[in-house]
């Protein structure tokens, strides 16, 4: 992840190169090509939003997209330190490329009959969720609308995922925020630069994330921050949390799990499977009995 300013500090740029992260998500969830693009865009967006909206160095933002399309809902979590994770409801859902231009039909698989919701922590530690109705279904335009409508942040958002040979070759995102004092001339130059960039994935392939940011801020005196953060797939699940999740089941249900030789718990975020032994499940009952004594 790279951050910077341009035009004398009146533009703020945040970028993420997430090719390895999205490939890891594709592999873990066995995602179809179009589902990979939809989730990858959402994951990149979550990291960018964490930087723009977060108040701490370890702030997290969760983005949920539910447009009623074949892929079902999409959920992604990103943090300011580059940790990302995410999943979709129907990982195998896919659509043929669009007939008009041959590109992946992300809008079709996501749908537009629903909303994009963003959850973050306020200064007091309480979670806050804002949302907008989906209009594009392409993710980037909807994230941009969210920032403008719910957060009153003038912005431009670019997101992209490109697969080659069944693997993610390029994935990432770029968010540009207009700060107080920005001039119409600067905005016009920025708009022209973005229009000339073409596909973000082409920029990432040819010049990397730095090249993409330089292209977006061409002629606007880009100044990069020195606190670059590598992006990586990271899930907070653990065996201990898997065991704790069984506390929501009654004693009879847990006894059935013990009688059947244990229980498998699946983490939806990363598809990690935990096979819990009868002894681990029985220990829950013993712990509850001691607590009640």
From Swiss-Prot:
UniProt name for this protein: 33 kDa chaperonin
Family in the record: Belongs to the HSP33 family.
Report the record's disulfide bonds.
Answer: 235-237, 267-270
UniProt gene name: hslO
- State its location(s): Cytoplasm
**A GO term for molecular function:** protein folding chaperone
Instruction: One GO cellular component term, please give it.
Output: cytoplasm
**Record PANTHER family:** 33 KDA CHAPERONIN (PTHR30111:SF1)
Keywords (A to Z) from UniProt: Chaperone, Cytoplasm, Disulfide bond, Redox-active center, Zinc
How is it modified post-translationally?
Under oxidizing conditions two disulfide bonds are formed involving the reactive cysteines. Under reducing conditions zinc is bound to the reactive cysteines and the protein is inactive.
């Amino acid at each position: 992840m790279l951050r910077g300013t341009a035009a004398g500090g009146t533009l703020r740029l945040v970028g993420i190169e997430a090719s390895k992260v999205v490939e890891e998500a594709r592999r873990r969830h066995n995602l179809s090509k179009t589902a990979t693009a939809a989730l990858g865009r959402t994951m990149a967006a979550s990291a960018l939003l964490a930087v723009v909206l977060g108040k701490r160095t370890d702030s997290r933002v969760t983005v949920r997209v539910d447009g009623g399309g074949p892929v079902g809902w999409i959920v992604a979590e990103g943090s300011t330190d580059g940790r990302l994770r995410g999943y979709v409801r129907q990982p195998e859902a896919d659509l043929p490329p669009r007939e008009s231009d041959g590109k992946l039909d992300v809008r079709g698989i996501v749908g537009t009959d629903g909303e994009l919701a963003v959850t973050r922590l306020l200064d007091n530690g309480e979670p806050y969720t804002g949302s907008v109705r989906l209009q594009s279904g392409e993710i980037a335009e909807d994230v941009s609308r969210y920032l403008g409508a719910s957060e009153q942040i003038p912005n431009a958002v670019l997101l992209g995922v490109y697969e080659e040979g069944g693997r993610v070759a390029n994935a990432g995102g770029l968010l540009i925020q207009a700060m107080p004092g920005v001039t119409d001339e600067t905005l016009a130059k920025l708009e022209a630069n973005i229009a000339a960039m073409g596909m973000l994935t082409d920029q990432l392939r040819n010049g990397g994330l730095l090249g993409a940011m330089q292209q977006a801020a061409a002629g606007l005196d880009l100044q990069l921050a020195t606190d670059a953060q590598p992006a990586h797939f990271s899930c907070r699940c653990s065996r201990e949390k898997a065991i704790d999740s069984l506390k929501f089941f009654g004693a009879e249900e847990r006894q059935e799990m013990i009688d059947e030789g244990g229980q498998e718990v699946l983490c939806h975020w990363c598809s990690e499977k935990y096979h819990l032994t009868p002894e681990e499940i029985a220990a829950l009952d013993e712990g509850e009995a001691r607590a009640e004594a």
